[in-house]
């Protein structure tokens, strides 16, 4: 026997028993985003490597350690580690953002070479939103309101907490960076080699360290909010006022900076403790300089992304009664001379007239006992049964697989009306 080939570590299959929940969550995402007037876009999975180096930042962990990169002739290419850079590239390339606002969303797989753990994988899926052309904090508030509406649709709104911060302008961050480095230089004895490297290359990333001793020290570190420029401070205060007005609760987290270099002003995360240690479900913020940085005109921009694997785990944990639709509603079984064509015609009739129902036709042979065993295993609500006598009399036997009504025989012309009463 040939040796079997396994999936790559950190890149997982989604089983037939798991996909209905994924489909339900994705449907809620699509419904909420479309209801706000946002438009779906689809970008390539592979992009030019310099796109991410320029957008995300050379010294970030994502670019320096986690990207899947390869050469194609003389061009260096990368499996996308996130969606914003590719969406900005597409918006510039196709002229989507000029002379009007654009509110876009996307969904799909991303790739990062990091240590696989619960809710964090090397191939993972994100739904993301990017908005171009709106500078005022109203759109910041709308994105947060949009995510909150989605959490309610998913039944997880009581298990997530909104954390907010403003990281200000480039100049404000430069001033804060100097103050933070001056403070941290006296505590290098507590730092790992990686943290010492961050102190030199990207000191703001130390703010979200997992080192407990360093976390205690950072409680007394300079606060970024104290270094904000007037414009960023006013923007942040207006955002907080809007959230207060609509009743969305939040925590101001002065250590929240996000892991990518393109952010400015507003940054936010929705976090949960329902999966054990606190983890991020959704995060985003403003990136007003990124479009210009990637070759476009200066364009105010904001966006967020949410991890679908995390959402799946969270929904499974806190909302076990999700109304997930079965993969099969109706199972057609048949046996005897002349029944095959009749069964095919019946299955197609149901699919044509009741397209919202999932109808499976038994195709692997066997007697009725074996076929009913398959029907039960499928999770279907009804079995439609055709034998030789049903073909002759133009009838169908209906069996309720989940209990309830007794088995009954109906004329073929009445079968659609009857099925409609059962769903």
Curated annotation (Swiss-Prot):
Catalyzed chemical reaction(s): tRNA(His) + L-histidine + ATP = L-histidyl-tRNA(His) + AMP + diphosphate + H(+)
Keywords: Aminoacyl-tRNA synthetase, ATP-binding, Cytoplasm, Ligase, Nucleotide-binding, Protein biosynthesis
InterPro entries in the cross-refs: aa-tRNA-synth_II, aa-tRNA-synth_II/BPL/LPL, Anticodon-bd, Anticodon-bd_dom_sf, His-tRNA-ligase, HisRS-like_core, HisRS/HisZ, HisRS_anticodon
One of the GO BP terms on file: histidyl-tRNA aminoacylation
Subcellular location: Cytoplasm
Main location: cytoplasm
An annotated GO cellular component: cytoplasm
Enzyme class, broadest EC rank: ligase
Entry EC number(s): 6.1.1.21
Keyword Ligase: yes
One Pfam family it belongs to: tRNA-synt_His
Taxonomic superkingdom: Bacteria
Family listed: Belongs to the class-II aminoacyl-tRNA synthetase family.
Self-association and partners: Homodimer.
Name of the featured protein: Histidine--tRNA ligase
Organism: Haemophilus influenzae (strain PittEE)
């Amino acid at each position: 026997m040939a040796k079997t080939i396994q999936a790559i570590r950190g890149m997982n299959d989604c089983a037939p028993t798991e996909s209905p929940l994924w489909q339900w969550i994705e449907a809620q995402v699509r419904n909420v985003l479309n209801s706000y007037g946002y438009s779906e876009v689809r970008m390539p999975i592979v992009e030019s490597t310099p796109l991410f180096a320029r957008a995300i930042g050379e010294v970030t962990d994502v670019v320096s350690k986690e990207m899947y990169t390869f050469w194609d002739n003389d061009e260096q290419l990368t499996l996308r580690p996130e969606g914003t850079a590719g969406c900005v590239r597409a918006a510039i390339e196709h002229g989507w953002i000029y002379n009007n606002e654009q509110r876009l969303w996307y969904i799909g797989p991303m790739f990062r070479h990091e240590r696989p753990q619960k809710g964090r994988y090397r191939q993972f899926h994100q739904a993301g939103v990017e908005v171009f052309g709106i500078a005022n904090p109203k759109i910041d508030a709308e994105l947060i309101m949009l995510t909150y509406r989605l959490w309610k649709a998913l039944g997880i709104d009581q298990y997530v907490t909104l954390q907010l911060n403003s990281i200000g302008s480039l100049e404000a961050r430069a001033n804060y960076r100097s103050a933070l480095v001056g403070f941290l230089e006296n505590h290098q004895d507590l730092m790992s080699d990686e943290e010492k490297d961050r102190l030199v290359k990207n000191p703001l990333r130390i703010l979200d360290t997992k080192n407990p001793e360093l976390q205690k020290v950072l409680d007394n570190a300079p606060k970024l909010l104290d270094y904000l420029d007037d414009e960023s401070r006013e923007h942040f205060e207006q955002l907080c006022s809007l959230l207060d007005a609509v009743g969305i609760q939040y925590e101001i987290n002065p250590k929240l900076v996000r892991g990518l270099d393109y952010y400015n002003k507003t940054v936010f995360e929705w976090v949960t403790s329902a999966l054990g240690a606190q983890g991020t479900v959704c995060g985003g913020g403003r990136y007003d300089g990124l479009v210009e940085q990637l070759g476009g005109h200066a364009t105010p921009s904001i966006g967020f992304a949410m991890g679908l694997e995390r959402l799946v785990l969270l929904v499974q944990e806190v909302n076990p009664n999700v109304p997930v639709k079965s993969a099969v509603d109706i199972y057609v079984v048949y046996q005897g001379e002349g029944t095959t064509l009749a069964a095919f015609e019946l299955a197609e009739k149901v699919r044509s007239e009741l397209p919202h129902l999932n109808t499976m036709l038994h195709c692997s042979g066997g007697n009725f006992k074996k076929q009913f065993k398959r029907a039960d295993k499928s999770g279907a609500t009804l079995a439609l049964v055709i034998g030789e006598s049903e073909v002759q009399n133009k009838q169908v036997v209906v069996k309720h697989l989940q209990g309830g009504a007794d088995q009954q025989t109906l004329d073929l012309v009445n079968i659609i009306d009857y099925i409609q009463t059962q769903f």
